[in-house]
């Protein structure tokens, strides 16, 4: 997958179930260890400018992407999709198995549908 064009990048958006709701993603993200959060934030920033190392991002299903970070045997993930020029973070979690858990993928797909119902298929111009 080619890196995104930095000139076309927007800003990170965080999943929330309604226009005025608190971002659910942030609650999940806050549960991760400090070091994992810091590393994932750096990766998220690097994604915006197209400066990710090989293996830091992986397509999961449909247009859901996985941002990946690990230290030793501890693996952390952010699942997201592109909403126009903006990446939308859907869920964050610790991964303790070989494959990304199907429940996390289903959560991301469900949240993507909810986001698009609440905010539209593309952001307003």
From Swiss-Prot:
One of its GO terms (biological process) is detoxification. The keyword Kinase does not apply. GO terms for molecular function: RNA endonuclease activity. Keywords: Endonuclease, Hydrolase, Nuclease, Toxin-antitoxin system. Induction: Induced by hypoxia and by DNA damaging agent mitomycin C. Part of the Rv1954A-higB1-higA1-Rv1957 operon, as well as the higB1-higA1-Rv1957 operon, which is probably the mitomycin-induced operon; the former but not latter operon is autorepressed by HigA1. Induced in persister cells in response to D-cycloserine. It comes from the Bacteria. Disruption phenotype: A triple higB1-higA1-Rv1957 disruption mutant has no visible phenotype. InterPro entries: HigB-like. Its EC number is 3.1.-.-. Toxic component of an atypical, type II toxin-antitoxin chaperone (TAC) system. Upon expression in M.smegmatis inhibits colony formation and cell growth. Ectopic expression in wild-type M.tuberculosis has no effect on cell growth; ectopic expression in a triple higB1-higA1-Rv1957 (delta TAC) disruption mutant causes growth arrest, killing a considerable proportion of the cells. Belongs to the mycobacterial HigB family. This is Probable endoribonuclease HigB1. It comes from Mycobacterium tuberculosis (strain ATCC 25618 / H37Rv).
């Amino acid at each position: 997958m080619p890196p995104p064009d930095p000139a076309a990048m927007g800003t990170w958006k965080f999943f929330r179930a309604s226009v005025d709701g608190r971002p659910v993603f942030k609650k999940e993200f806050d549960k991760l260890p400090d070091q994992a959060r810091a590393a994932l934030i750096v990766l998220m920033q690097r994604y915006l400018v197209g400066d990710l190392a090989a293996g830091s991002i992986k397509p999961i299903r449909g247009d859901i992407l996985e941002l990946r970070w690990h230290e030793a045997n501890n693996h952390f993930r952010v699942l997201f999709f592109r909403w126009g020029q903006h990446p939308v973070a859907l869920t964050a979690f610790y991964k303790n198995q070989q494959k990304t858990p199907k429940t996390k993928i289903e959560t991301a797909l469900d949240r993507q549908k909810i986001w698009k119902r609440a905010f539209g298929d593309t952001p307003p111009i």
